[in-house]
């Protein structure tokens, strides 16, 4: 489906993937105090796995997806979580060698998977993670890249923040701070009630573009 979408979209697909949810323990005060994955997985009848299993399955998935997008001949895969016989993807995506793979996550083990497989690394910004949290996680990612012999500049750093319709200046200030910290892609998430989005361009994007140096 992703390969077909990339063809339909004339090579504009960004393929986002992640663990999706695990039985991780942590601070979920921004989600009402409960791990949101519990309700989501129960709704679809999908078992919620431990973090170590979810991350290992993610790594296998990335390996399989990349091979299906790039290999011309059918292949077998005998993994811990996935076993394939004669797997092949046709038609191939339009982008070569493949669409950019965006992986969301910021845990230690997840960052290792990101180092190995991702073209874009995405995390949530405030109020979930602070700008200083991003700096710390970025340093860990850079260390993993050095250990694996990968140029950290190959991985685009992406952060999602929530737009404030009541205070666009606050959104601009936060985005500018993130860019100064090394974020290359700021994703602006609208919150309900949603009004026509022209204000986002007029009050956030264009003033930010004029204020923040590029290049």
Walk through the language-model features, giving the residues of each:
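Active-site-adjacent structural elements that line small-molecule/cofactor binding pockets in enzymes
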Residues: 1-215
